Amino acid sequence: MKIAMTTKEASEKWGISQRRVRVLCRDGKIEGCIQKGKLWIIPENTKKPADGRIKGKESLLELIEQKKKELDIRRPLTEGEVSKLHEDFMIEYTYNSNAIEGNTLTLRETDMVLKGLTIDRKPLKDHMEAVGHKEAFYFICHLVKNSYPLCESVIKQIHSLVLADRPFDRGIYRRIPVRIHGAKHNPVQPYLIEAKMNDLMKNYAEDRRNIVIKLAELHIGFESIHPFIDGNGRTGRLIVNLELMKAGYPPIDIKFTDRMRYYDSFADKEKMIKLFAEYLNRRLDQYLQILG
């Protein structure tokens, strides 16, 4: 008589993905499951666990606000603690944000480059992008400390650090038309960039809605303008984190493995809101767990 089942068998039995079964095992939501190496063994008669995930954008945004309030109660972290959290976050964030744009460094290689090492047979450009992104992240941390408002000048400064490998294009709006492969719409013409960026900053400054909603719209708007010749994606994601941290939230790290979902979200504001909200919700959980 069979007394146990694999995650694949549980997935088929319960009608959920195998990945979801593994997550439930890892989070202790499946009673009696045992991990053996990389495998999970689940008792045959175990009932399907309740799906505790938050459904719907509004309820997830409400949950984020609740967790933010809880985080505020447990603070403040010391400057050293914040610095350590940012350092740990920055390495993987730099890897993911650069990888989304085609950088070939692995996570381990990115870590090594940020420690001053050189990776054999990897382009100098990839090394410089890693270092530039690191500097840009620490720059936005400085901006958060000093409560600098978001403006075009700040965005250009962020971009000038991101584009470490292109000194003549750093912090300068493009002067030629560009096309984004796979995009449904072309970025605005160069002569419209100044006006469009001015409108984007004005609308964002006047927006009083939930931080996740307005940042999703800001990000889509910024990337649709595509103001720089290169480095728009990395700069745009740094802007999102700058504003999250200024509002007292932890920064988010959109994973390279999630890039297709991220790309698809540019065509649907609701998808981008949901993507940002899910990442922010998980980051808040991490911070709350650290603080006990």
Give residue ranges: language-model regions.
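Beta-hairpin "wing" of winged helix-turn-helix
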Residues: 33-35
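Minor-groove-contacting beta-hairpin "wing" of winged helix-turn-helix DNA-binding domains
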Residues: 37-44
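FIC/Doc superfamily catalytic core
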Residues: 1-13, 18-29, 44-230, 234-292
